[in-house]
Each structure stands twice: as structure tokens, then as C-alpha cells.
Amino acid sequence: MNLIQQLEAEAIAEFKAKKEIPDFRAGDTVRVGVRVVEGERTRVQAYEGVCIARSNRGLGSNFTVRKISFGEGVERVFPLYSPNIDSITVVRRGVVRRAKLYYLRGRTGKSARIAERKVTKA
């Protein structure tokens, strides 16, 4: 392991000690608590939508969340280890057979629905 990989691994371990990141993947509906600065105040804004992509690249990992806001599709890319992310919660798990769900961009209504994955406890 070279020096950069070692520093990234330490930074990720330090971040995971402070915050818990749930196990989620594309197709899952997630609620992301984002810290928003308004003047001198900071507040947490919830952004809920379907995770359509996840990129695992060490400290540069990110995920894309898509939601429909007032009839318009809105996508937002979140860095996974960003200090501006307050919390990530999985609302429901979805059944998909792709790692990237970019095809949802062209779909609306019932065709854009994702079936729920039943979680069985072993």
C-alpha cells in the first residue's frame, strides 16, 4: 500500500468512527440529511430519493440520488465522506438488476417504479 492509499484509509477510518454509513446500493430509496448554511445559521435539509448510481473510489466515493420535485426530475451527487452530509438513512430497499439506473431518467409515472426487496433475516 503506497502512502496516498494509506492516508485515504486512515481518513476513511476516522470518518467511519464519527458517523455510521448504512449499506445501500442502486435502487434503494435513501434520505440524506444535508447541512445547509444560511447566513450565520446552519440547518439540516432532508433530500429523499432513489439512489441511481454509486461510485466506490476510496475517499472520492459518491452516490447519485434522483427525486421528482414539482413534476421535474432532480438529481444530486453526494460525496460519501463529505462533512456536509449529516446522516444517510435507507427508507426502502429496491430490487434492480443494474448497478447504474440511468434509464430512470427517461421514465415517468408507473414505469419508473422500483419493486421493494424483501429483507429476510437468517
Swiss-Prot record:
Pfam family, one: Ribosomal_L19
InterPro entries: Ribosomal_bL19, Ribosomal_bL19_CS, Ribosomal_bL19_sf, Translation_prot_SH3-like_sf
Claim: Ribonucleoprotein is one of the keywords in the record: yes
GO MF assignments: structural constituent of ribosome
PROSITE patterns in the cross-refs: RIBOSOMAL_L19
Any GO BP: translation
SUPFAM superfamilies per the UniProt record, alphabetical: Translation proteins SH3-like domain
Statement: the UniProt record of this protein carries the keyword Cytoplasm: no
HAMAP family documented for this protein: Ribosomal_bL19
NCBIfam families: rplS_bact
Function: This protein is located at the 30S-50S ribosomal subunit interface and may play a role in the structure and function of the aminoacyl-tRNA binding site.
Family per record: Belongs to the bacterial ribosomal protein bL19 family.
PANTHER family: LARGE RIBOSOMAL SUBUNIT PROTEIN BL19M (PTHR15680:SF9), RIBOSOMAL PROTEIN L19 (PTHR15680)
Protein name: Large ribosomal subunit protein bL19
Lineage: Bacteria, Pseudomonadati, Pseudomonadota, Alphaproteobacteria, Sphingomonadales
Record gene name: rplS
